């Protein structure tokens, strides 16, 4: 496993389990059109490897993954609730959905030794036409990397095995 695989695993899980659906992005694919909100951007912040001993490349690796969620809210005609308040509440709801999609997903949890740390930040940006609710999650995902991750195997896969017996003749073919 490596950091690109970590990002892909989490991106896939978020696409499947949040209200953002297919609108989960990796860096540099962020749309600018308002009709494409809510959206989620997944990027790798950093990676830290701690050696498990001398001579053999075995590491406990921690990848810090950053998940940026964005929602957009506009002021309604009545004064019952402000767009900034709606954006904040939607950002809070998105934070909960993002955490459930990762922590509650056994396919994600089984790939890692642990989710060592989660940091969450919520805010509202009111500079544009609407109010953007912003949630930032930073997750420290810990996993093992060993020789198999650094020295790829060049073994040719087994395609056919011929087995001969006395009665009856037997041929096995693997596809």
PLM feature spans:
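Short acidic low-complexity segments
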Residues: 26-34
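A short, hydrophobic beta-strand-centered structural micro-motif
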Residues: 35-50
